Structures are given as structure tokens and as C-alpha cells.
Amino acid sequence: MKDDIQTFDVVVIGAGPGGYVSAIRAAQLGLTVCCIDDWVTDGKPAPGGTCTNVGCIPSKALLASSCLFEEIRDKASEHGIHVEEPTIDVPTMIARKAKIVRQTNDGILYLFRKNKITFLNGRGFFVTSDEDGYLIGVEGRDETRVFAKNVVLATGSKPRQFPGVPFDEERILSNEGALKLKSVPSTLGIIGAGVIGLELGSVWKRLGADVRILEAMPSLLPFADSAISREALKAFKQQGIDMEFGVHIDSIQNDGDRVIVQYKDKDGKNSEMWVDRLIISIGRVPFIAALDAPVVGLKLDERGFVEVDAENRTNLPRVWAIGDLVKGPMLAHK
């Protein structure tokens, strides 16, 4: 099985914050390493995972732009700086964000070259296994197979869909679509007052959207200290973001021109929200299907996470899983 196929000490599937760092560290320890990742942006490989491509990095770039706009609009005159009413060029703002993301992508590719890591741009998946390791297939820009003595699974997660409501990334948006809007929506609805919903709501509110957030939990950040929750709620209300808690979403309808959300409020009363765009941020789920895990018998728990022990070992010999694939906070620094 291995005679005409390149063999590596370690193959890492996924090049997000967990995957690319694992690959680099393994290479620094003297192991031969291959890292496989299928993310492509504008026809170019885009390692870095959700954090780099559609998460932490681009959201902070847009947050900085929106904060600067707000400062100029609302605070410049306090400093004796008088400007005409500032206007927003969203495409230029998005282009700046994309440039920052590309710089990060290219930085990771440089680190791979520096550490003599073989990078393959495509979907990595299990083909078969034997007593020596695992045959890994690659489909995408790079089409090949490699043999791994050890495997690190780091394919991350994807946004959770509302049942029966797919993301079209035009009117019904995940975090990815919300970071690529071509103009400021007049009305923006958000389902879920977690990190993603709050941050993106804050960005588009500063830029002029009327933002309304519906949250199933009875309060904002209920698992945080109560004082923090109160101060956060106060800050978001001062921005003018409308929040409603304790709601139950009954249906979401996209009629092409607007999105209609039917829900029950905290008192059980039927209500509706009509918006131009809707961001659904109700959590994320492990991105496991592309691995063809059943081929080798990888064990998952009842929620679809890869089962691991205290050292992140799976039920398969010499296979580890890290990051969003395993239980715990879905955070880049986990």
C-alpha cells in the first residue's frame, strides 16, 4: 500500500489554529509532516481555518473600521475637528478586511515552507488503514494520496443551521455571509446573542443598520458573572441594539425581498420580526463528515464530537483529535 505513496510521520488534516500549530510543532521536533486543508479564497489556498478566514481576524478588521467611522461621526467635533458628514464605502471596507485575511493566509504558508512542511490544498479523508498507519486521500486543488504513521484531526466546525432553513449567504446569513455584505442593510435581525451575533450586530449597527437580536436564553451572557452580564447589556443598549430574551423561534421564511421570523416572546405571545437580512448564530457543530470517518471506525459521541481521552487520543491507534472536533469551548485558543 505504501510502495509508491509518500509516507509522513504525521499528517494533520485541517490548518486552523489547532492544525497548523500542531504541524509546525511536529516539524520542529524533527518529524516529517504533511498538512492538508481545503480552504480556498479567490483561487488561492487559504490556511488558517474559521478564525483567520471567517472569524476572529475579519470580524476584528470590520470592527475596527466601524469603530473608526463612529468616532469620526460622533466624536471628532469634541476634539475641534470638523468634517462633513462621513459616508461609508462598504466594498472598500470589505476589501481592506480581505487584504488582512490574505496576509495572514500567506504568513501561515510561509511558516509551512520555513519548517519544511508539505502543504496540500484539498479535502483530506481516510481511505483505509493497516497496522502501520493510515492511507489519506486528498481531493481539491491537489489530488493525491499520502500515508500517515500518525494522524491529527483538526477540521474544526461549521455554523449550526436552523432546522429546514439553509444559509443562502444573501439574506439568511452565517458568520461568513455577514462578513461579506456589499452594503449596510436597513434592518438586520440576529438569532443568537453569543459572541458572533453580538460582535457582528455591533459592527453593522455602528455603520447604520437597525439591529434587533432574538435570544432563547433568559438573559445576556447567562453563564458569565451577573455584573459582567449587566454591564454588557447596558453597553449594547447604549449602542442602540434592540434585544429580546427568552424567545422561541417558530419559523423563518425568506420571501426573496425580506426575511420573516415568527416567534413566541418570553410570555408565550406570538410575534414577528421582518428584516432585510438575518444572521443565524445559534452555535456551531463539528465538521466531521468530510473525513469519511466510518471507513476506519472513528468513534463519535451522541452530539457528533470525536471522543478523546485526556491526551486527545481517539479510539484509533495513533490518531488524535483537537479543537472544535472535541468537547469544550469552540475557541481558537482552546
What is the meaning of each model-derived region?
Residues G14-G19, G156, G192-G197, G208, ...:
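Conserved phosphate-binding and hydrolysis motifs of nucleotide-dependent enzymes
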Residues V21, Q161-P163, D168, E199, ...:
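Glycine/Thr-rich phosphate-binding loops of Rossmann-like dinucleotide-binding domains
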